[in-house]
Amino acid sequence: GVHVVKTGYVNRLMDFKEAHDGQYGVRHYRKVIETAAKYQIAIDNHEPVMPTGIERTWPNLMTQEGVRGQEHNAWSPDGGNPPEHTTVIPFTRGLAGPMDFTFGTFNFTNEAYPGTRVNTTLCKQLALFVVIYSPLQMASDLPENYKGIKAFDFIKDVPTDWDKTYVVDAKIGDYSVFARKDRNTSDWYVGCITDENARELDVPLSFLDADSKYTAQIYADGDDAEWKTNPTSFKYGEKIVTASDTLHVKLATSGGCAIRFIKQ
């Protein structure tokens, strides 16, 4: 049978009565979650009311939107989410629980809506899988846009269930660096993102296990990457690191860096 349902609502008024965030909507959302729990169905709720921590009572609510997500880059007349958007929401909306932002796009323009685009580089899309927490993730692009691209390996590898989380460095609205440990393996993952400004960051690896070596699989913005003119440029490399090392990371404008650490 069906074990997971993603819900979504297209009308401004539910049943032509009240807005999603009215009392009618609040009762409806709660009823959906309770009924789904009865049948052991997990929910990914889009267009929800403000997150309140209800997943503590109903853990089948795996994740929900409740944020100006990446879909706004596809059609929003205001140009979509600005580059600094994802450097803010982990520290605001993210405090209220998991959010389904729907990142993972490799094709950055939308021919159906001329003038719209995803306002990041490819590597920032990868890094968001670490920066923004959701126990259910998706790859938001078409399958053909991933074919033959090494960067898709990171999306296939990155888990959604974490054992430890550290904010290694951040300035809200400018940049952030998150490190998370996979709950089911000894692997660590790091995501670094920046706003419209290119920047260089030093990432200390003190969160790794002492006296152990790791293979770092690094997906970084290319030297010529730029979110408006060359968002798909990236480079991949591997190196052996330990907890005493510090990685120097270069981020393009609205860029990112995604790293997987595999314990040897």
Which residues does each PLM region occupy?
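Aromatic- and carboxylate-enriched substrate-binding clefts and catalytic-loop regions
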Residues: G1-E111, G115-R117
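Generic beta-strand/beta-sheet core signal
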Residues: V5-V10, D44-H46, G191-D195, Y219-D221, ...
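Acidic/polar loop patches that form or flank catalytic/metal-binding clefts of enzymes
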Residues: K6, Q40-E47, H72-A74, P135-I149, ...
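Conserved, mostly hydrophobic/aromatic
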Residues: I43, V131, V190, S254
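Glycan-recognition and catalytic regions of carbohydrate-active enzymes
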Residues: D141-Y189, D224-N230
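Carbohydrate-binding surface patches
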Residues: I172-Y214, A258
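Solvent-exposed beta-strand/loop surfaces of large extracellular or lumenal domains
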Residues: I218-S244
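C-terminal beta-strand-rich structural cap/linker in extracellular carbohydrate-active enzymes
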Residues: G237-Q264
